[in-house]
């Protein structure tokens, strides 16, 4: 199927599937097949923020006074988060936009990816405010085996979908000889790669950030690195929205009532999808061991983090219809919810930067019915 950025063929976008239908031509929002994506877009736009709004001058002093094992925890997490959001700042656009068929999903993907670039900029803002030579931190990201191994598990699903989609657009379905290698292209196989890629992205948003989040908030609970925690809190708020987006996409694909023609694919890929979740949980436990190899920090250690990983993995898998792989348990670090739920804490504006504000949340549309109860 040849791809075009503007299809001249008139179609009814309400009857198009989310993926692998006719490419989007007119970006219209007066009619929507799935209104949830418009709601996500509006919410993300209301969240807009810039890392430069947060003062990190105190964090530099705090960081210099941290023991070496806590400096290792702090910097290692920033490196890993930089890698994750470097991937997420570009990959959803490259992988999903060429195969999306409805405008509201197309715009949500673009809005989502843009917000990830703000996260990447945030890590640079944090790092250059606490160390004298940021290049030493960034240059180590690719060469650090503990980070590199996890990156491979994330990028492989994106890369495979992107490559196969390119072949499909250029050559169509069939068996093709490319550089001496036979490539089998068919729509059903593409749908499988799409579903597994979406699962991998869901896992990234659902699990992979939360070890780093927990460590950042644990520092702030001790009134250390508080500027960093404010930025991470804004990032966590965004990531929760992105997680909601991927969960909705996956649940819509698996619901037979939506006519997405993916039910069989979902069933066939279920075992591999579950393995992606479990594998990610094990990798995050390994990462926790790496972080705390030289000692724990006050309020958090490897064992507690591993319990938390199992706890959130159960919740995330249940949210998309999978069975919980680990023993059911309560949240081992309940205080983290105060940081992950942005409305829980009231702060006087003159005391600190507010990290829970929303932009453009006033509804300016007023109907005649609003005035019926008024009497002159």
Swiss-Prot record:
InterPro entries: Ferritin-like_SF (IPR009078), RNR-like (IPR012348), RNR_small (IPR033909), RNR_small_AS (IPR030475), RNR_small_fam (IPR000358)
Key word Iron present: yes
Any Pfam family hit: Ribonuc_red_sm
Known function: Provides the precursors necessary for DNA synthesis. Catalyzes the biosynthesis of deoxyribonucleotides from the corresponding ribonucleotides.
Protein's UniProt name: Ribonucleoside-diphosphate reductase subunit beta
Subunit structure: Tetramer of two alpha and two beta subunits.
Key word RNA-binding present: no
Binding sites annotated in the UniProt record for Fe cation 2: 116, 205, 239, 242
Keyword field: Deoxyribonucleotide synthesis, Iron, Metal-binding, Oxidoreductase
Catalysed conversion reaction: a 2'-deoxyribonucleoside 5'-diphosphate + [thioredoxin]-disulfide + H2O = a ribonucleoside 5'-diphosphate + [thioredoxin]-dithiol
Cofactor note: Binds 2 iron ions per subunit.
Cofactor dependency: Fe cation
Positions annotated as active site in the UniProt record: 123
Species in which this protein is naturally found: Buchnera aphidicola subsp. Acyrthosiphon pisum (strain APS)
Example GO molecular function: metal ion binding
Entry EC no(s): 1.17.4.1
Family named by the database record: Belongs to the ribonucleoside diphosphate reductase small chain family.
Top-level class of the enzyme under EC nomenclature: oxidoreductase
CDD domains: RNRR2
Biological processes per GO annotation: deoxyribonucleotide biosynthetic process
């Amino acid at each position: 199927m040849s791809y075009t950025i503007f299809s001249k063929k008139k179609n009814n976008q309400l009857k198009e599937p989310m993926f692998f239908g006719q490419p989007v031509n007119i970006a219209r929002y007066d009619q929507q097949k799935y209104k949830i994506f418009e709601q996500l877009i509006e919410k993300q736009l209301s969240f807009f923020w810039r890392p430069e709004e947060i003062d990190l001058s105190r964090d530099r002093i705090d960081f210099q006074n941290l023991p070496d094992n806590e400096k290792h925890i702090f910097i290692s997490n920033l490196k890993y988060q930089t890698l994750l959001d470097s991937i997420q700042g570009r990959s959803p656009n490259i992988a999903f936009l060429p195969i999306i068929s409805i405008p509201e999903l197309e715009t949500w993907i673009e809005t989502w990816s843009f917000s990830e670039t703000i996260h990447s900029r945030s890590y640079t803002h944090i790092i250059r405010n606490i160390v004298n030579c940021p290049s030493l931190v960034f240059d180590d990201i690719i060469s650090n085996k503990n980070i590199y191994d996890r990156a491979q598990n994330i990028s492989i699903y994106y890369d495979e979908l992107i490559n196969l989609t390119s072949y499909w657009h250029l050559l169509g379905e069939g068996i093709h000889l490319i550089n001496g290698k036979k490539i089998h292209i068919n729509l059903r196989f593409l749908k499988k790669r799409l579903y597994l890629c979406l699962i991998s992205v869901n896992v990234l948003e659902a699990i992979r950030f939360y070890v780093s989040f927990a460590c950042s908030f644990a520092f702030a609970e001790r009134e250390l690195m508080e500027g960093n925690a404010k930025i991470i809190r804004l990032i966590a708020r965004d990531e929760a929205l992105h997680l909601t987006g991927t969960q909705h996409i996956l649940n819509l694909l698996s619901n037979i009532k939506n006519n997405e023609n993916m039910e069989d694919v979902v069933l066939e890929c279920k075992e591999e999808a579950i393995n992606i979740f479990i594998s990610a949980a094990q990798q995050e436990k390994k990462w926790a061991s790496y972080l705390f190899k030289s000692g724990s920090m006050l309020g958090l250690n490897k064992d507690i983090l591993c319990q938390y990983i199992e706890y959130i993995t159960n919740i995330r898998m249940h949210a998309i219809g999978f069975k919980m792989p680990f023993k059911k348990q309560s949240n081992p670090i309940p205080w983290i919810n105060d940081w992950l739920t942005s409305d829980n804490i009231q702060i006087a504006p003159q005391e600190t930067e507010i990290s829970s504000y929303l932009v453009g949340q006033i509804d300016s549309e007023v109907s005649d019915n609003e005035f019926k109860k008024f009497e002159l």
